[in-house]
Every structure is written in structure tokens, then in C-alpha cells.
UniProtKB/Swiss-Prot annotation:
Keywords annotated in UniProt: ATP-binding, Cytoplasm, DNA synthesis, Kinase, Metal-binding, Nucleotide-binding, Phosphoprotein, Transferase, Ubl conjugation, Zinc
Classification via PANTHER family: THYMIDINE KINASE, THYMIDINE KINASE, CYTOSOLIC
Catalysed reactions, as listed in the record: thymidine + ATP = dTMP + ADP + H(+)
Transcription in keyword set: no
One GO MF term attached to the UniProt entry: thymidine kinase activity
Gene Ontology CC terms: cytoplasm
Originating species: Gallus gallus (Chicken)
Catalytic center residues: 99 (proton acceptor)
Gene: TK1
Main location: cytoplasm
Protein name: Thymidine kinase, cytosolic
UniProt keyword Zinc present: yes
Subunit structure: Homotetramer. Tetramerization from dimerization is induced by ATP and increases catalytic efficiency due to a high affinity for thymidine. Tetramerization is inhibited by phosphorylation at Ser-13. Interacts (via the KEN box) with FZR1.
Length: 224
């Protein structure tokens, strides 16, 4: 599958409007936001009314727009829940959503908008740093017309990277950060501890079935 192929459906056409959901998955640093912005700009050039939504708590690079890790930006509407932009979305033909995994109503919103004839493009992490499903985002897969998963470059060995590895000891699922907190990694490097992770506080990257020799006396548990 060509990961850059966009289905040729024209939202808001004079005949019957045909909605669709496009999903762009991948680990951190795989170019998800870059691809989302490329697709939205493509529709803007064709004079479609577009709405780009960003997660309001992600203020790493820009507070008023979507930003890639290399600081390319695009104006966006910040929100913590997609219902907050419902009316604006109804007035748009194309809706782009960045960091879709953080929105609790992502599945319901996308399905509702697609059923009203909108093209909805979602960029999201498919998995957490523990390689578990991120919220309800994977429930979009059976509803979507187009699903792609981009790979990054492993930041530890430079091979293809499909996973996101947390560098710190935080246990919460939602910890927003860049290269200071996360690496994109391949399968082998996901299980390889970095020097600062050799202590006993971070065991998320240990493969199942491997016995732990360093057992802490106590450990704070976070709900995830």
C-alpha cells in the first residue's frame, strides 16, 4: 500500500456528498502531523473549507496551531474534546484532527461527521509507550475508508521504527513531550534499556516472560 495515497472522494460535491474517514497512524517522529497538514493543504488549494483541530494541552511548539517537530506550523483550533468544535465542523467540508488519541470522543465525532458528508483526516499514535492501544483510537479502524501506519527511524540504531519508547520513569499514559521524553525505536531497541533506565523504576520496556532481578521495595501505581 502506498501510504501517501488519498482516496479520490470529493466532499461537498454538487451531487450527493460522500463522507469518509482517513487515519494516519505511527509512532512519534514518523511524520504523522506532516502528512496530516499535507492532506489538508491539498484540499485548501482546491478551495474546500477546512478545519484543523489540535489537542489544547499540547503546547510544546505552538499554542494556536499544529506544529511538526521541525517547527512547520498550520493554524488550528485548540480543543480538549471534539464536541467543542462541533458547530465549526458542520460548516467545513474537510476536518483534520492532530493527536487524535487524546480526544475521548474521537470515534463518535468522526463517524458522525463522515455520515454528514465530511472528509475527516486523523493523525494519531496507535499505541502507548507500553505498546497497548491508545484510548479508543483503534476503534476507528473498522469505520475508516483509509488507514495507514507510518514508520519512523529508530533513534538508537537507525533502522525502521514502529514503536514509541519513553525515556523517563513516568507511569501515566498521557505525558506530552518530544525527543526529551520519547524515542522512536525498532523492536530490538524497544527492549534495550538505556543507561538512565537501568534502575528499577521503569519496567515498561521489558518483554513478557523475562524475570526481573531488581525488585523495588515499593512502587507508586498510576491508573492507565
Amino acid at each position: 500500500m502506498n501510504c501517501l495515497t488519498v482516496p479520490g472522494v470529493h466532499p461537498g460535491s454538487p451531487g450527493r456528498p460522500r463522507g469518509q474517514i482517513q487515519v494516519i497512524f505511527g509512532p512519534m517522529f514518523s511524520g504523522k502531523s506532516t502528512e496530516l497538514m499535507r492532506r489538508v493543504r491539498r484540499f485548501q488549494l482546491a478551495q474546500y473549507r477546512c478545519l484543523l483541530v489540535k489537542y489544547a494541552k499540547d503546547t510544546r511548539y505552538c499554542t494556536t496551531g499544529v506544529s511538526t517537530h521541525d517547527r512547520n506550523t498550520m493554524e488550528a483550533r485548540p480543543a480538549c474534546a471534539l464536541q467543542d468544535v462541533y458547530q465549526e465542523a458542520l460548516g467545513s467540508a474537510v476536518i483534520g484532527i492532530d493527536e487524535g488519541q487524546f480526544f475521548p470522543d474521537i470515534v463518535e465525532f468522526c463517524e458522525k461527521m463522515a455520515n454528514t458528508g465530511k472528509t475527516v483526516i486523523v493523525a494519531a499514535l496507535d499505541g502507548t509507550f507500553q505498546r497497548k492501544a491508545f484510548g479508543s483510537i483503534l476503534n476507528l479502524v473498522p469505520l475508516a475508508e483509509s488507514v495507514v501506519k507510518l514508520n519512523a527511524v529508530c533513534m538508537e540504531c537507525y533502522r525502521e521504527a514502529s514503536y514509541t519508547k519513553r525515556l523517563g520513569a513516568e507511569r501515566e499514559v498521557e505525558v506530552i513531550g518530544g525527543a526529551d521524553k520519547y524515542h522512536s525505536v525498532c523492536r530490538a531497541c524497544y527492549f534495550q534499556k538505556r543507561p538512565q533506565q537501568l534502575g528499577s523504576e521503569n519496567k515498561e520496556n521489558v518483554p513478557m516472560g523475562v524475570k526481573q532481578l531488581d525488585m523495588p521495595a515499593s512502587r507508586k501505581i498510576f491508573a492507565s
